[in-house]
A protein has these predicted regions:
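Alpha-helical architecture
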Residues: 80, 111-112
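Membrane-anchoring alpha-helices and their flanking helix-loop junctions
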Residues: 1-106, 118-238
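Conserved SAM-binding loop
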Residues: 112-113, 118
Length: 238
């Protein structure tokens, strides 16, 4: 399943992002796996376009020639930040295992329980922004794979939730105490956290405690984000 997922989603997405002269750009040929989706509707890959909302709002206040330079700068910064967070997370985890810590809860793990997944999401988001605001040659396939990015991100979050369940089984209250002190991915104000988790609390009343709960959670938020994206497409005629 992991291999099939990589071939169908991760590798073609990376190929989409790669520059024309980049040695891995040939991975873009795997985008042909998405053609059945395009047969359903040419805009199906836009069903994750809610990810572009901050930049769509920028278009309302900036002129067209300003948009591209600002967005490219932001995309570069987010991509670089993602690589930094991922590298720090990996280095911290390896050091913790080398020192035989049961729970890695220091350095960057004091601020995020899953910095490696966070780094991947930020890195891929930066690249998603980049391909959405770049010049294409005439006739190029120019629909950013926002739906694929959304699904990939939700898979990463689902894996992180599964790891938390396993850690709680293994370390019990010790890991639960760490969870109370450290945010899941990003430190956010409590009102924002409550807003984000409101749909989950309505459905499950508590955090996911089984694989079934994880599937319900990831499907729920995926459906919500796809619905919001569809509403955005209709409203802005994307």
């Amino acid at each position: 399943l992991a291999v099939l997922g990589s071939v169908a989603m991760y590798l073609p997405t990376f190929g989409y992002f790669a520059s024309a002269m980049f040695f891995l750009a040939g991975l873009g040929v795997l985008r042909t796996l998405w053609l059945p989706l395009l047969e359903i509707s040419p805009t199906v890959l836009k069903l994750g376009c809610i990810a572009y909302l901050p930049f769509l709002l920028l278009e309302l206040i900036l002129e067209e020639h300003q948009i591209y330079s600002v967005v490219q700068l932001v995309a570069t910064a987010i991509t670089g930040l993602g690589l930094l967070v991922f590298t720090l997370g990996t280095a911290t985890w390896l050091y913790g295992k080398f020192e035989k810590h049961e729970i890695v809860d220091f350095w960057i793990y004091k601020y995020s329980r899953h910095p490696q997944y966070l780094g991947f999401i930020l890195w891929s988001y930066g690249l998603l922004i980049y391909v959405g605001y770049k010049d294409y040659i005439r006739g190029a396939f120019r629909v950013p794979p926002t739906l694929i990015w959304l699904i990939t991100t939700m898979i990463a979050i689902g894996v992180a939730l599964h790891e938390e369940i396993e850690m709680k089984k293994k370390y019990g209250k010790k890991y639960e105490e760490y969870c109370r002190k450290t945010p899941f991915m990003i430190p956010l104000p409590k009102p924002i956290v409550n807003t984000i988790t409101a749909p989950l609390k309505l459905l499950l009343k508590e955090h996911p405690r089984s694989m079934k709960d994880i599937i319900v959670t990831t499907v729920l938020y995926t459906v919500i984000l796809i619905t919001l994206s569809y509403m955005l497409i209709l409203a802005l005629k994307l």
